[in-house]
Amino acid sequence: MEGAEGQEELDWEALYLRLPLQNCSWNSTGWEPNWNVTVVPNTTWWQASAPFDTPAALVRAAAKAVVLGLLILATVVGNVFVIAAILLERHLRSAANNLILSLAVADLLVACLVMPLGAVYEVVQRWTLGPELCDMWTSGDVLCCTASILHLVAIALDRYWAVTNIDYIHASTAKRVGMMIACVWTVSFFVCIAQLLGWKDPDWNQRVSEDLRCVVSQDVGYQIFATASSFYVPVLIILILYWRIYQTARKRIRRRRGATARGGVGPPPVPAGGALVAGGGSGGIAAAVVAVIGRPLPTISETTTTGFTNVSSNNTSPEKQSCANGLEADPPTTGYGAVAAAYYPSLVRRKPKEAADSKRERKAAKTLAIITGAFVACWLPFFVLAILVPTCDCEVSPVLTSLSLWLGYFNSTLNPVIYTVFSPEFRHAFQRLLCGRRVRRRRAPQ
């Protein structure tokens, strides 16, 4: 009877671990498995070792579950806050912020659909949910993560056009932004559907059913297509666009510095992209770059300096110089003569112009470095391994594989921080969500 009970327990554990019973050996003192045996030829440690065979392993698994659970929670909360802020705060409902809204939705899907199953797989260290769910999970992973990355490309494009084209802000309608969002999700869908339609390596079913490992298709052609579409082409576009944005900011700052040296008074910058102060709005960082470049004086759009005479023209509509994203109108850091002093009397106590402009240039570099650096640092390790493993048939440590995957997921945790922390309007909206409507929105000086 006791042996029958032990055999029943043995059958349950073997069913859970999918181990061939006839090849297992057992201790003579009882029905406890000896996990240090080789089960069958060609099997791996995924089958030959128990998930929590020692107290230390159980503690490690519990710690891992807590850390991953907190990461998932932080990702959900951060993106829900961004979505709620845009939907509930009227002044944040703009065409440009729709890109941030869609990005937050993509990252929220990563947190709700992809990361939980990934956490279970990471803690248990084997896939016991079958090939069908594995196929759905990996395809959903590709869809949501690709959409998240491509949204960053769309935001970079929106920001670049706003910087370089004065008319873009007024042409950036909800319809145009909606088309960008539709393109992002369409491309992401085509990248993920390829695996569901059968673009898999020959060992995919065996890897899931026998090795109990669930990874995306390791077919070389698919990996080249997927990694190029999801990362390598997007990261190249992002780097080029942000480099051009930085060059534009730097050129304007130095142009203003040169004008000051010639005439003694620095004119406000009025480049083709000066309208970025009016609209920007792509998640707050566009507005931060605007602040770096410099806001033009309210109601004054052009100033020409000839010797000691300033001739100002007021031929630009006020909305083009106001900050449509609701940012506070901080006084500029350079003087515009008597008119500027009348608007901002504190200008006479400002730092020397050269130091202020150098600070703006460093801030521009820092802001754009944070955007690109966080994205590249999070996703580059994963995509290097993704293309390296199937092409060279390399053996990569499971720990390294897991770290690179979760570092990529961590980008969905960072996005709501990076793309809103530079915007006072988003920060104030978060305060209103947390503290209620008692927190009043600060208004720019009229």
From Swiss-Prot:
One of its GO terms (cellular component) is plasma membrane. It is a multi-pass membrane protein. Pfam families: 7tm_1. The keyword Disulfide bond applies. Residues 89-98, 158-176, 250-367, 423-446 are cytoplasmic. PANTHER family: 5-HYDROXYTRYPTAMINE RECEPTOR 1B-LIKE ISOFORM X1, ADRENERGIC RECEPTOR-RELATED G-PROTEIN COUPLED RECEPTOR. This is 5-hydroxytryptamine receptor. It comes from Bombyx mori.
